From Swiss-Prot:
The keyword RNA-binding applies. Its main location: cytoplasm. The gene is pth. GO terms for molecular function: peptidyl-tRNA hydrolase activity; tRNA binding. GO terms for cellular component: cytoplasm. TRNA binds at Y14, F64, N66, N112. This is Peptidyl-tRNA hydrolase. The keyword RNA-binding applies. The lineage of its organism: Bacteria, Pseudomonadati, Pseudomonadota, Alphaproteobacteria, Rhodospirillales. Residues 184-225 are annotated as: Disordered. The record marks N9 as: Discriminates between blocked and unblocked aminoacyl-tRNA. The record marks D91 as: Stabilizes the basic form of H active site to accept a proton. NCBIfam families: pth.
Length: 243
């Protein structure tokens, strides 16, 4: 059994953020392959299913990004899933918009969600890095990742999500190079994302060393909040299945 994780912040407030592209990818996988419904378990929204005969558990943490390892670790221990059988989809500032890269192990690259998973499970899990581009200056990163995708970004975002969902069976078969090749052939990454003006974090959020956010004093998200956000994100971002 594989554990397939999408990273993001829970709730409609963050549903369209660039930082939530991992959630969007999990939603695209669920819809393309008929997996669901999602239910609340392991401090996350989870759904069991199969892709090309391979059993998997889709998981989107209901913790905030910086505590993603709590949910992933809990699910992995319960199902006795080794880190080598865990695939995490997440946003990547250092890749051009629409470009993806896959790697196993390595460092967190400044991504606090990945860092927290490493703290709970070690570094041996797989990462599918979904390029969102860089705003051009480190002072703009927080505003950029917590900003919603612009309409102009739909030109590469929806095709990337579609391609990931179309060819994900290759990842489950242990063929990451073929997966990357197929996604690249199906998409045409944008050359560069435009930087946004620097802004302060939203009220109730704290800046972290890696540019992610933690919500201060916020109530826990409702059990159905993330499922609704996943559905909303997919309806907005996926090209296929809409006639």
């Amino acid at each position: 059994m594989k554990l397939v994780v999408g990273l993001g912040n829970p709730g409609p407030r963050y549903a369209g953020n660039r930082h939530n592209v991992g959630f969007m990818a999990v939603a695209a996988l669920a819809r393309r392959h008929g997996i669901g419904p999602f239910r609340r378990k392991f401090q996350a929204q989870v759904a069991d299913g199969q892709i090309a005969g391979a059993r998997l558990l889709l998981l989107a943490p209901e913790t905030f990004m910086n505590a993603s390892g709590q949910a992933v670790g809990e699910a992995a221990r319960f199902h006795k899933i080794a880190p080598e059988d865990i695939i995490v989809l997440h946003d990547e500032l250092d890749l051009a918009p629409g470009k993806i890269k896959v790697k196993q192990g390595g460092g967190a690259g400044g991504h606090n969600g990945i860092r927290d998973i490493e703290a709970h499970l070690g570094p041996a899990f797989w990462r599918v890095r979904l390029g969102i581009g860089h705003p051009g200056h480190k002072d703009r990163v927080l505003t950029y990742v917590l900003g919603d995708f612009a309409k102009a970004e739909e030109d590469w975002l929806a095709p990337m999500l579609d391609a990931v969902a179309d060819h994900f069976a290759l990842m489950l078969e242990g063929r990451p190079a073929d997966f990357m090749s197929k996604v690249a052939a199906q998409t045409r990454p944008a050359e560069k994302a435009k930087p946004l003006a620097t802004a302060k974090p939203k009220e109730g959020e704290a800046r972290t060393s890696g540019g992610s956010v933690a919500e201060v004093g916020a109530p826990p998200p409702s059990p159905t909040g993330l499922a609704a956000a996943l559905a909303e994100a997919l309806d907005r971002k996926s090209q296929k299945g809409n006639g």
